[in-house]
Amino acid sequence: MDKQYQPTLTEVQDWVLKLYNTCEQTITKAERLEQHKYAVMVQRPQDKKFLVKMLDESSQIRDRKILAKRIKTLLDQYGVPEFLNKRDAFLFKMYQAFGHHFDFIAIPIIKKRLRMDTSQVIINEERPQLTKHLATRFKEKIGQNVNLLGEVVLGNEEADHRYHHYLEALESPDINYISVKISGIYAQTHALNYEESFPELVSRMSALYQKAIDFPYTDEDGIKRSKFINLDMEEYKDAHFTLRLFKAVLNLPQFKNYSAGIVVQAYLPDAYDFQTELLEFAKARVDGGGAPIKMRLVKGCNLEMETVISSLKGWPNPIRPSKTEVDANYLCLLERGLMPENARVLHLGVASHNLFSIAYAYLLAQKYGTTGYMTFEMLEGMANHLWRAQSMLGNRVILYTPVVKNEHFLNAVSYLVRRMDENTAPDNFLTHSFNLKPDTKEWDFLAKQFEEAYAMKDHLTHVSPRVQNRNLPYTPVAPSDTMQNEPDTDFDLSQNQEWVRRIFAKWKKSGTEEPEIIPLQIGAETVVCKNRYKYLDRCQNDEVCICEMSQADSAQVEKIIEIAETDPAGWRKTTLEERHRIMYEAANRLADMRGDLIGCMCAVTGKTVIEGDVEVSEAVDYARFYTTAMKKFAALDDIEIKPKGTILVISPWNFPCAIPVGGIVAGLAGGNTVILKPATVAAPVAWMFAKAFWDAGVPKEALQVIITNREALKVLTTAPAIKHIILTGGTDTAQNIARANPVTPLSAETGGKNVIILTASGDRDHAIMNIVASAFGNAGQKCSACSLLLVERSVYEDKNFQSKLKDAATSLKVGSVWNPGNIVGPMITNKNDKLLQAFNL
């Protein structure tokens, strides 16, 4: 048999027409009306916006009066949707006119109607409703891939609840196929916690597989079979980990003869490699006497989220850049997946509503004789006439079926909103399928879309754009007049996880090494002082000395000030263009020493790797920003730029890299000499990044780094030679400096207490995620940490909100930063009288 068989465009188009005609025979009057509603909505973006916002806000706002006013506002803003029938349009107009005043009547009716109208898409999990639905589909010989919707998993308690929910569902005689998400059964998975979370996830997936075996179902032929579990792919960040988990569990001897499935997303360039890995695994498994497995091929549904995350982090988008490429990759994966030698070991679920993709898969399977290894999979409640037509044509069909209990229905609305948004996107097949007819512009658009994908499928590259490797030398960025942010580290990549392990190997001291002695810098000279500050590893019970740093006395401080004032190296005489070049070089060197800066922050201040990483990115941005911005000012008419003299930068310990770098670059960019006095407890970090500036071309006389005692610090802050002081620190420190030296300009960013306000209209689940991140990020040691939560009464009295907030907070992993899975590291010191006083209130 020719393994390179490809259906021709004519064959595909002929079969699409056959499938379309069958669909037309099966579609009901109610379904045609529903299709017409969608067709109208697609033509009127304001109708879609209204519906999406109303659905979303109805799921978030618990207060009837507030929700009633909000729906009225949406109607005023977007108008009554035209896709509504006459009765519903009239009711909305009456609501807009006066009904919103009767919220106690209107809102329960709206929510009940919402549940009723979505009952075909989101199935009620309560019995006997679910029993009836599953029995109907079983009689129709339509498979049901049950997706259990519920509360958002924010902590361990909810994850445990969802996990046991899956186990209970598998005991139900009429549920024989479920989809499981890692995020639904375990709350603490993140890139640097994979190794620690892996055994627990193996245990949980094993228990689910065993439950599927222990509670078999009886098929239509009276044969008992193990239930099927499909492992869903979610965000790109967990894709490789999910595949690894899937293989590891099925490799256990007790599951040798158990068949399970996993999703592969065609919009990822990695999908081809995922399929390759699955094929190799499946062939070895079957050759060893084991059962085949299944790949559920989808196009992908997290495009917007992946795009936003990539943009925020400065990473390449992991998604293929066009819909045509995604469709082409889908066809490519179908071609390989349906070859006999592949399909027999790796069964294929073709998950698509696209008639052309379906036709292509059907023709391939017919040619290869692999239809018995393939199922067509669609969404329950979406274009039901399509799956009926498939069934009529003899194809096996499985419907992805979200189910939810009544008390969690509003949590399921987000699923509904996402599906509706996807299915009405401009280039989505379903957008053009409503009222679809041959020889129309919609039909021609879809046919052309397929033809373009067909032409492209053999010319795709299958290389992920996410190739960042922190183990390699940094690629320098040339000086530019356009500012671009430095990307954070992509810890999802295995090579960067290895990089973290190398950082730990270097910076986690054993205590047997001689601690480094950091000298005192006085201009271009250094001297080791008898008076030194010892730095102990907070994560090793303060028992391991990392280094010692020399402290300046008053006389040495005066010498340092003199050097800065006289500027013997002539930094003030440099041109802005020269400084711009040097600052870019410093930025490159900072980026190249990212690992050491992170390691130093971990060891000295107890900052976690992820928190240290974003700080380095910010420091690199600062190094590029100030001269880039200053060049724009210099280009303005009537603007003269000249140095002020010597700038004193006093920086804090909680952001020991980004904040001091920002201060010194602000001074250096203007041609000023800078004295940096970092917080003593974090000073080794400053000593390290100062080397980047010196090596880049900043004279040591122009940038001096010191730590001092209290008496010498007063000499520094009151010296007439200091022309400007930049302080980030406590309010009392700023006040003391201002009192002691009211003449020198002081730019002070001082402490504060951050308040997060959550209204009754807010998304409480997302609020909890952000509250916890704000309150406990950097161990809460920052003025921007959420110290007070201000909520409306209805939120305050919401016991579910309180429970979920507590669950999310208490589930955070706390401990040594040398365990990369920990989210919260140690406090900088145990001697915090104010904090201890607060605990005792």
Where are the regions that the model predicts?
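Structural signal for hydrophobic packing residues in well-ordered secondary-structure cores
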Residues: 138, 170, 174, 250, ...
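Rossmann-like NAD(P) dinucleotide-binding subdomain of oxidoreductase/dehydrogenase enzymes
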Residues: 602, 630-766
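Generic beta-strand/beta-sheet core signal
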Residues: 147-149, 180-183, 230-234, 263-265, ...
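ALDH superfamily catalytic-core signature
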Residues: 697, 719-720, 724, 731-841
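Positively charged, amphipathic and often flexible ligand-engagement surfaces
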Residues: 1-487
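Long, K/E/R/D-enriched contiguous segments that form extended
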Residues: 218, 223-225, 236, 241-250, ...
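Conserved short loop/turn motifs at secondary-structure junctions
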Residues: 148-155, 232-237, 262-268, 352-353, ...
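Terminal low-complexity tails and localization/encapsulation signals of metabolic enzymes
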Residues: 406-562, 566, 573, 577-588, ...
